[in-house]
């Protein structure tokens, strides 16, 4: 069975450094950090008091105040990013094509904020105080649900929740839905709002978060000797994926082609990768096989790079394993150094960065990388963005708790 080609024709995003794709990209190329002190709840008892927050968010032109009360913030973020992507694509929905257009949008955690609020209502006032909208306001698949309802999309609607790999997995599976003929267009990505009391407290209890409260903007420092954990980030990233001939026929703007998708499992530990990065290497190898290219053809790797002691070293080793002699030449950076870790949305926003790197032939930096750790000796594009030429392929990595891994490869077109 021959697969159909899949291209990217629309992009949408909310991030800690910008509320649009272009404002975010401009900030990243300038090396700007979006990490700040948490101001929406009292953090005095918390070991970590900062995160990558979405700022100046207003969605009233898209979602009424009445409807906002029925949605956790992650759903609102996802809808706004989805609308941006749909508008960017210029796609017209008709009665004829609606059955061939769907959505694949996930979240690592879902509506944690409203889960907390409704639990408080339950404890204070009993079950009658729980909102009747509690369940649909918090479950993971509701970004896809709302967007299909808003646009009348009657194709596949799915939501994959695989922790921090959710964004990549939804995009990859959406591409396969198109490639194997079950849809012509898919809105795909991820959304997250985990900077809540329970989210910050839970990751803090696991000692996964940085506690650099005296200098939050320097807290996310992938591959640096002084890294002490990741930084939570909020936001959403959405891509419109489209079958190539369908996109050409309507004269769509094409950002890139999605040519490779690879997955694997560590089968090692609940939250830590093996030191040799074998699972990450396998995901990259599978993506390269799917794309039909050699590792040496990749110009840039947008790394998972979370700023954790174990994860950063394992990924560096995985890149060395897969790229071999080419490892010293490939550019590898972690945009999480500026945005923090958007969990289930990370792979989605970072796929967009990988696509824009192809468009502009520019690679965003890894900021805060002052003293690379032992074994972390790749070209991590420290401090400043890098202009390149002739870059044809980029690779985006995402790895999650439970040992789930995913890689995507994009091609300039």
Swiss-Prot record:
Organism: Escherichia coli (strain K12)
Pathway: Lipid metabolism; fatty acid biosynthesis
GO MF annotation list: 3-oxoacyl-[acyl-carrier-protein] synthase activity; protein homodimerization activity
CDD domains, per the entry: KAS_I_II
Enzyme class at the top of the EC tree: transferase
Keywords, ordered alphabetically: Acyltransferase, Fatty acid biosynthesis, Fatty acid metabolism, Lipid biosynthesis, Lipid metabolism, Transferase
Keyword Heme among UniProt keywords: no
Similarity remark: Belongs to the thiolase-like superfamily. Beta-ketoacyl-ACP synthases family.
GO annotations of cellular component type: cytosol
Full protein name: 3-oxoacyl-[acyl-carrier-protein] synthase 2
Effect of residue 207 to G: Impairs the binding of CoA. 10-fold increase in catalytic efficiency with dodecanoyl-CoA and malonyl-CoA
Gene3D superfamilies: 3.40.47.10
Pfam families registered for this protein in UniProt: ketoacyl-synt (PF00109), Ketoacyl-synt_C (PF02801)
Protein's gene: fabF
GO BP annotations listed: fatty acid biosynthetic process; fatty acid elongation, saturated fatty acid; monounsaturated fatty acid biosynthetic process; response to cold
The organism's place on the tree of life at top rank: Bacteria
